[in-house]
Amino acid sequence: ILSNCEGAVELLETLTKKKDPTFLTWLPLSHSYEHTVQFIQIIVGAKVFYAESLEKLISNMGVAKPTIMTAVPRFYQNLFTKINMNFEKQKGLKKKLINQTLELGKKILKKEQLSFSEKILNFLCEKLVRKKIRSQFGGNLQAFVSGGGALDQNIGEFLNAVGLPTLQGYGLTEASPVVSCNLPNLIKVESVGPPFRTNKVKIAKDGEILIKGENVMLGYWNLEEETKNVIKDGWLYTGDIGELDQNNYLKITDRKKDILITPGGDNISPLKIENELVNSEMIDQAIVYGDNKPYLVA
């Protein structure tokens, strides 16, 4: 756990050196993600607020004025829906300005060069749109950190574009739990960022992500056989499929056990389809079924 905290503190240094850090916590304190975050809060000397409830989370942000907040993808999905619904109600010049904010924000996120006129327009977007959105969340937010599941790429792009920096990370309880996280100065929403310096990551021949480091568990309590299945030669076999890009950013593509195989031999990722379905405001949860079946259903 301390090794995990060390890696996280290095990430947070750029976010906490300008202001005294303030966290707003709402995940269960027994959750492995939140459990480790609590130690990190102590290490960086943060002021910690505990949310009253999920329903009051947004209003609590106005009081706490957090600089950093950790949450699971479900929260960001709800946030995306609420902001987007408000955007849809706008008309005329406001609507055009919102569209420009999204377009220019996504270009900046992808490190694309803005023209002189785009820079002027982006300055207006910053003052008239992004600043107002940030003020609704306390006005001091340096970053949202997403973990505990896959964050939809469209949602990540949207939140970053409207002025809410959102860093997606990756981890699992067996690794204490954080393995990697996006960096504030180079956010790749399609990835979960570079591995922490305190652990090693490599990709097996079949694409499985393997982890080694002091953050990896010793084993499952009184489950020797299960431990042998996941820890081999000091490497933790995560069961996740992924790849490392040229910047050493890790991208999760699937769960090894979740791949659906059709009678025709096609390998299909249900996660991608499920994520597309739940983007609809009419769908709360989705599951795709059809392993070894002639067609898929959801």
Name every feature range the model reports, one short phrase each.
Residues 69, 159, 201, 240, ...:
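Residue-level signal for inorganic ion chemistry
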Residues 12, 19, 153, 160-217:
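Extended hydrophobic/aromatic segments used for targeting, binding, or gating
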Residues 2-22, 29-130:
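Conserved AMP-binding/adenylation subdomain of ANL enzymes
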Residues 195-262:
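Conserved ATP-binding/catalytic segment of the ANL
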Residues 67-70, 82-187, 284:
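Gly/Ser/Thr-rich phosphate-binding loop
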Residues 291-298:
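Conserved loop-to-beta-strand segment in the C-terminal subdomain of adenylate-forming
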Residues 26-31, 148-150:
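Conserved AMP-binding
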